Regions:
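Acidic, surface-exposed loops and disordered segments
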Residues: 1-205
């Protein structure tokens, strides 16, 4: 399956085979593909919480997740979080394979870009989560699996359950597995004419 096929065939699947297990090798392959996603300054803010404990998944589903079946039935349930302060934690490790002059340049830019801009740090973390999520879902599709991004859960309660560290932000979950029911037909995309702007927006006088 090529990239365009994965993009067009990816759907948000709700019903999964609860008995199907993704192998450890496949899980590793999915995660290694996910971390190929781009991040600003190559900071790689994401931290992936693999929700593997059946009791924990059941608790999230029943108490904080609106009883969404994919939370317990999918082979994998991954909660995306990100470290908003990753930019200041051993920054040279993000450029360990780059020429020294390149690493020096980027690391010296990194501090002033983020320093004192809490809103930007949070935005960058969430942007990184979004790109990693899409990478994961496309990789899953290419490997013959389906996925579902989910934000319909009590973020604060789940953050407590997983002991979310200070300075981390919560993102959505992604369920991955073998579907047992076809999703609804695609609801339809807006026409490009509604979405694409050439150069500038029109002024409204």
């Amino acid at each position: 399956m090529n990239t365009l096929e994965a993009i067009y065939q990816r759907r948000s699947v709700k019903a999964y085979d609860p008995n199907y297990q993704i192998t450890p090798e496949e899980e590793q392959k999915l995660l290694e593909a996910t971390i190929q996603a781009p991040t600003s300054f190559n900071i790689q803010h994401w931290r992936f919480v693999i929700l593997r404990d059946p009791e924990l998944r059941q608790k999230i589903r029943k108490e904080f997740g609106n009883d969404q079946a994919q939370m317990t039935d999918a082979s994998l349930l991954i909660l995306f979080t990100a470290d908003t302060k990753a930019w200041q934690k051993e920054p040279y490790r993000y450029w360990q394979n780059a020429p020294q002059e390149v690493a020096d340049l980027l690391v010296n830019w990194m501090g002033p870009f983020h320093q004192g801009r809490e809103w930007l740090q949070r935005d960058e973390a969430q942007r990184s989560i979004g790109m990693a999520m899409q990478t994961l879902m496309l990789a899953a599709k290419a490997m013959g699996y389906d996925s579902c991004p989910m934000i319909g859960f009590d973020i604060d309660k789940v953050a407590e359950l997983i002991n979310l560290p200070d300075d981390y932000v919560m993102g959505p979950m992604v369920a991955i597995g073998k579907k047992v029911k076809e999703p609804w037909p695609k609801p339809g995309q807006l026409p490009l004419s509604d979405l694409v702007v050439e150069n500038t927006f029109s002024r409204k006088d």
